[in-house]
Structures are given as structure tokens and as C-alpha cells.
A protein has these predicted regions:
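Membrane-interface helix termini and inter-helical loops of multi-pass transporters
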Residues: 98, 129-143
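Short, Lys/Arg-enriched, Gly/Pro-containing loop segments at transmembrane-helix junctions
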Residues: 29-33, 133-136, 273-280
């Protein structure tokens, strides 16, 4: 158990923590700072804070996980999805903050890249994996949902939705990191209890995020950027699928879902009503800020909610 759990957490934490003092000054020299939205006056002081810190997270996960690939082959597709979406995020960040192309990847380019990575994962799951695409139904007493070929469109929706959910969640210091630590811990506990064969990478993600949080907690000295947030989305959804638990994302990843829905609702309502808004700002974490909540309070509440939801999900196994 030490080999499977403790070592990945410690090693990935150490790598992430040690990379901080090296990577952050390097990013500052490259002037890869983030530009904050003018509507949030409290965020204007963050202008220029280095982004692309997700490289620290990715490096920690990759370095730790490669030592477990031989004994735990099921971590390979999860590592592929994590790195694959991390690369998409890196390209987006690079275009925005290094090449100063404000839009980064165009919407269709980003979606195409996400579909390509998802397709590789879908082909693996459908043709090469011994993990079926049936889904454990929460609170069903161990019953599984078999959609047949319908599982593939659901997989695409789950991947795209989760990845964009983690992306929208990354809007406050430590928010995406803290929420995903809870989610990764949940998957780690389940993986260990069910001998799912993926515990080393789920534990590595916990350690990597704890190490990154040393520099990302308020006031953050680095942001993960799309490099980190998209990678985390890829991790969450692929880990869930490798344990036949994508339906549990709706529970443990409810914050991701709410963040996405708040944006969809806001944009749709804005267009339908000619400029009216339901929320003061979307994603919804900014709405709470404009309601007077401090940034740290929003992060704490969202993290506590996620922790409670993880306990609820565990009861539903």
C-alpha cells in the first residue's frame, strides 16, 4: 500500500513544490502574465501574475506515473488524457500569453483538438481496454447502466463537459486545485478499495496539486492556466471511466457542472433578453464575489461542498 499510495503522493508533491521556485521566476522572465477582467476590481492587482503553472502539475504527474506504468498499465490511458488535454491547454496559453494572440486557440480549433484526443481514448476503451463502457449507477446497490453503442456519444459529452468544467472553475486562487484535490482523493480511495489498478496516478495528482497549491493559494504567485485546468479535466473524466464511474462525476464534480451551466445560462439569457443577466457575472464564482464574498470564502465553501459530495458519492457505491 505504501508503494501504491504514499510514495506517489510524496514524490509528486516534492516535485511540484521543488519546481515552483524554478518555474515561476522563469515564467516571470518570459512575461507570461495573465490579464484580469476589468469588472473585478479586486482582481486587477493580479495582472501580470504568471500563468501556465500547469506545467508544474503535469511534470509532477508524468514523472511520478512513469515509474508505475509497468505494474499498473491501466494508468496509461489516464496519463494520455491528462497529458493530451494539457497539451491543448498549453497551446492555448502559449498563443495567448507568449505570442500575445488574445484569443488563443479559436473555439473550433480547441474543440477539434479535444475531439481528436477524446476519439483516441474512445477507440482504446471500445477496442482495447478490458474495462467495459458500462456505468455504475450511484445508490443502485451495484447495478450498471449499459447503453451499448450509445455509450460513445455519452463519453464525448462527459469528456467535453468535464474538461470545460474544470477550465471554468479555474478562476480564483486555489479554486480548481482545491476542488480537484477532493475529487482525486475520492477516486484514490475508491481505486484502493476496489483494486482498480489506477491508484498511483490518482494519488500522484493529489500530491501534485498539494505541491502546486503552495504557490496557487491566495494570494497566488502563479496560475495553472489552461495547461493545468484542461489537464485536470482530462484526468477526472478518464479516471472515472477506468473505474466505470462517469455517472459519479455529476456528484463529486458538481462544482464543475454548476460552473459550466452558469456560463451557458448567462449567455443564453443575455442573448434572448437583449442584454439582461441572471448572474452578476459568470462563471458563478465571480457572481458570489460581486455579492460581497471574499475570494478565500468562495474557495473554502466550494471545497467544503465538494468534500461533502465526495462523502455522499462514497455512500452511493
Amino acid at each position: 500500500m505504501t508503494y501504491e499510495i504514499v510514495i506517489p503522493v510524496i514524490v509528486s508533491f516534492a516535485i511540484s513544490a521543488l519546481l515552483g521556485p524554478i518555474v515561476i521566476p522563469f515564467l516571470r522572465r518570459l512575461k507570461v502574465g495573465q490579464t484580469e477582467r476589468k469588472e473585478l476590481e479586486s482582481h486587477l492587482k493580479k495582472n501580470g501574475t504568471p500563468t501556465m503553472g500547469g506545467l508544474m502539475i503535469l511534470a509532477s504527474i508524468i514523472i511520478t506515473s512513469v515509474f508505475y506504468v509497468k505494474d499498473y498499465p491501466k494508468i496509461v490511458p489516464i496519463l494520455f488524457m491528462t497529458v493530451g488535454f494539457g497539451v491543448i491547454g498549453f497551446l492555448d496559453d502559449y498563443l495567448k500569453v507568449v505570442l500575445r494572440r488574445s484569443d488563443g486557440l479559436l473555439a473550433w480549433q480547441k474543440m477539434l483538438c479535444q475531439i481528436v484526443v477524446t476519439t483516441v481514448f474512445a477507440v482504446y476503451m471500445g477496442c482495447y481496454s478490458d474495462v467495459p463502457l458500462t456505468m455504475l449507477i450511484p445508490f443502485s446497490g451495484g447495478k450498471y447502466l449499459d447503453l451499448g453503442w450509445g455509450a460513445f456519444p455519452v463519453l464525448y459529452l462527459a469528456v467535453i463537459g468535464t474538461v470545460n468544467g474544470t477550465n471554468f472553475t479555474d478562476g480564483l486562487d486555489g479554486l480548481a486545485s482545491s476542488v480537484t484535490i477532493m475529487v482525486a482523493t475520492f477516486f484514490s480511495v475508491v481505486a484502493i478499495g476496489t483494486n482498480a489498478g489506477i491508484a498511483p496516478i490518482t494519488c500522484a495528482v493529489v500530491g501534485a496539486l498539494l505541491g502546486f497549491l503552495l504557490f496557487n493559494v491566495y494570494p497566488a504567485s502563479v496560475f495553472m492556466g489552461d495547461t493545468g485546468s484542461l489537464a485536470l479535466g482530462g484526468f477526472v473524466v478518464s479516471a472515472a471511466y477506468m473505474m466505470q464511474m462517469p455517472l459519479f462525476i455529476v456528484i463529486v464534480g458538481l462544482i464543475y457542472l454548476v460552473e459550466v451551466l452558469s456560463v451557458i445560462i448567462q449567455v443564453t439569457y443575455f442573448k434572448k433578453t437583449g442584454g439582461k443577466r441572471i448572474f452578476k457575472m459568470a462563471p458563478i464564482h465571480h457572481h458570489f464575489e460581486l455579492c460581497g464574498w471574499s475570494e478565500t470564502r468562495v474557495v473554502a465553501v466550494f471545497s467544503i461542498i465538494t468534500a461533502i459530495l465526495c462523502l455522499v458519492a462514497y455512500l452511493g457505491l
